[in-house]
């Protein structure tokens, strides 16, 4: 296997240099990048002596350097008729053309990242988030107060610059971030995921990370929200790719590196699996807030929020009974229960074999009461007419209101999504590194 992997790398490099000489630069770039991947694999798993590793590493640097020059040339070729960079061209000789192409590249990367800026506010207020008072207070401390009362945060009293929200799935971490985007109306809110920062071009991903932070500093006060931060900043290990390692290193440098002033910039991360985060990244998140499963009072509030203005006849006692029965359910689970129960009246209409006339508000003029609306009923009801929903005129249907039996039926068919084992892992992480919300 040693011979085949190393030989494959050598064959690829040979083809790359041939394509390079033939001025097929796109193909040459692709082959150089593939060759480097094979060489790195050989260094990691197959080269046993330090001398062999050093020799392969030196070759990698040489081919990467050529790949970078080809990549710069291919990018700039569309904009200017730029001549190819000679293999033996020195840094000094290429400085003029490099400086010409550098700004457009930076501008292009920043334009790409501008898509991550949340231009429209989500319109979710603190009151729309049930419970999580500790998390809300920490976010107000970090985001709202420094903007409203900047004189409070002078000298050694500085706002938090890195906050990690962690907890089981569906507990409201991303929802809290939306509330921050709404409430921090003077801040620029960047919402990024791994897809915004990953690139097929070698070396471009870390440039995107760097430009993201530069863009945030230019538009401060700003918030960078990274959902599922574990996908970008997992623990460093032997098996990860060079690109992943470089992205992680750039994150570390930008979040708290020498020469980077992040005043007015908050990095807000969210994850369901905090135990896989790299320890250095974990340290950069100064405040680590555990977002637990909702307590009974918060669950009751969630039922009310999700029911909203939909017609229903549930009493406070019914709501509290539902809250008691949903121990171990996340906010997302409760949302699904309510959404399913709101569909129960529609299912009653679909399955009904009899309808009866009732009095209710007109569809065209809700202030006017009319007495010829039709609603589903049992065959034994007085005035029951045998018909299906297909026979009911579109403006004459009065759907049943949501009732407790609808909620219980939906609850019986919806199981909690949070696994007991995962919950134990999150609680263990919270005991070791977190703060309760």
From Swiss-Prot:
One of its GO terms (biological process) is intracellular cholesterol transport. It comes from the Eukaryota. GO terms for cellular component: ATPase complex; centrosome; cytoplasm; cytosol; early endosome; endosome; endosome membrane; extracellular exosome. The modification N6-acetyllysine is found at residue 8. Residues 1-84 are annotated as: Interaction with CHMP1B. Its EC number is 3.6.4.6. Changing residue 228 to Q: Defective in ATP-hydrolysis. Causes membrane association. Induces vacuolation of endosomal compartments and impairs cholesterol and protein sorting. Inhibits HIV-1 release. Increases binding to CHMP1. ATP binds at residues 167-174. One of its GO terms (molecular function) is ATP hydrolysis activity. The modification Phosphoserine is found at residues 95, 97. Residues 2-80 form the MIT domain. Pfam families: AAA (PF00004), AAA_lid_3 (PF17862), MIT (PF04212), Vps4_C (PF09336). Residues 84-96 have a biased composition (Basic and acidic residues). Ubiquitously expressed. Keywords: Acetylation, ATP-binding, Cataract, Cell cycle, Cell division, Congenital dyserythropoietic anemia, Cytoplasm, Cytoskeleton, Disease variant, Endosome, Hereditary hemolytic anemia, Hydrolase, Intellectual disability, Membrane, Nucleotide-binding, Phosphoprotein, Protein transport, Transport. Proposed to be monomeric or homodimeric in nucleotide-free form and to oligomerize upon binding to ATP to form two stacked hexameric or heptameric rings with a central pore through which ESCRT-III substrates are translocated in an ATP-dependent manner. Interacts with CHMP1A, CHMP1B, CHMP2A, CHMP2B, CHMP3, CHMP4A, CHMP4B, CHMP4C and CHMP6. Interacts with VPS4B; the interaction suggests a heteromeric assembly with VPS4B. Interacts with SPAST. Interacts with IST1. Interacts with ZFYVE19/ANCHR; leading to retain it at midbody. The MIT domain serves as an adapter for ESCRT-III proteins. It forms an asymmetric three-helix bundle that binds amphipathic MIM (MIT interacting motif) helices along the groove between MIT helices 2 and 3 present in a subset of ESCRT-III proteins thus establishing the canonical MIM-MIT interaction. In an extended conformation along the groove between helices 1 and 3, also binds to a type-2 MIT interacting motif (MIM2). It is linked to CIMDAG syndrome: An autosomal dominant syndrome characterized by global developmental delay, severely impaired intellectual development, poor or absent speech, microcephaly, growth retardation, poor motor skills with inability to walk, hypotonia and spasticity, and cataracts. Cerebral and cerebellar atrophy, thin corpus callosum, and delayed myelination are apparent on brain imaging. Affected individuals show hematologic abnormalities mostly consistent with congenital dyserythropoietic anemia. This is Vacuolar protein sorting-associated protein 4A. It comes from Homo sapiens. The lineage of its organism: Eukaryota, Metazoa, Chordata, Craniata, Vertebrata.
């Amino acid at each position: 296997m040693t011979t085949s992997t190393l030989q494959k790398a050598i064959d690829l490099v040979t083809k790359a240099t041939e394509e390079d000489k033939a001025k097929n630069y796109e193909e040459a770039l692709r082959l150089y990048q593939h060759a480097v991947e094979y060489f790195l694999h050989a260094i990691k798993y197959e080269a046993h002596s330090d001398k062999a590793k050093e020799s392969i590493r030196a070759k990698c640097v040489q081919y990467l350097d050529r790949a970078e020059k080809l990549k710069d040339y291919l990018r700039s070729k569309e904009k200017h008729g730029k001549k190819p960079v000679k293999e033996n061209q020195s840094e000094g000789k290429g400085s003029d053309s490099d400086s010409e192409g550098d700004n457009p590249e930076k501008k292009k990367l920043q334009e790409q990242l501008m898509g991550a800026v949340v231009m429209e506010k989500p319109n979710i207020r603190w009151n729309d988030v049930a419970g999580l008072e500790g998390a809300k207070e920490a976010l107000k401390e970090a985001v709202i107060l420094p903007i409203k009362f900047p004189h409070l945060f002078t000298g050694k009293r500085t706002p938090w610059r890195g906050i990690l929200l962690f907890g089981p799935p569906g507990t409201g971490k991303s929802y809290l971030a939306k509330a921050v985007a709404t409430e921090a109306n003077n801040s620029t809110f960047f919402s990024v995921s791994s897809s915004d920062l990953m690139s097929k071009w070698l070396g471009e991903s870390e440039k995107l990370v760097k430009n993201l932070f530069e863009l945030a500093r230019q538009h401060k006060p700003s918030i960078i929200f990274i959902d599922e931060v574990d996908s970008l900043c997992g623990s460093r290990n032997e098996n990860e790719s060079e690109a992943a390692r470089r992205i992680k290193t750039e994150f570390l440098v930008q979040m708290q590196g020498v020469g980077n002033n992040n005043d007015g910039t908050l990095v807000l991360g969210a994850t369901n699996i905090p135990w896989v985060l790299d320890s250095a990244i974990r340290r950069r998140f100064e405040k680590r807030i555990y977002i637990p499963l909702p307590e009974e009072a918060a669950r009751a509030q969630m039922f009310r929020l999700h029911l909203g203005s939909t017609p229903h006849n549930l009493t406070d006692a019914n709501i509290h009974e539902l809250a008691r029965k949903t121990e171990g359910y996340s906010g997302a689970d409760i949302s699904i229960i309510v959404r399913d129960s709101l569909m129960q009246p529609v299912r009653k209409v679909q399955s009904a074999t009899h309808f009866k006339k009732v009095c209710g508000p007109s569809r065209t003029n809700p202030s006017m009461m009319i007495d010829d609306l039709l609603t589903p009923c049992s065959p034994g009801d007085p005035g029951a007419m045998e018909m299906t929903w297909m026979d009911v005129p579109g403006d004459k249907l009065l759907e049943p209101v949501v009732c407790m039996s609808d909620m219980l039926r939906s609850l019986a068919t919806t199981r909690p999504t949070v696994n007991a084992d995962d919950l134990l892992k999150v609680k263990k992480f919270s005991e070791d590194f977190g703060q309760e919300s």
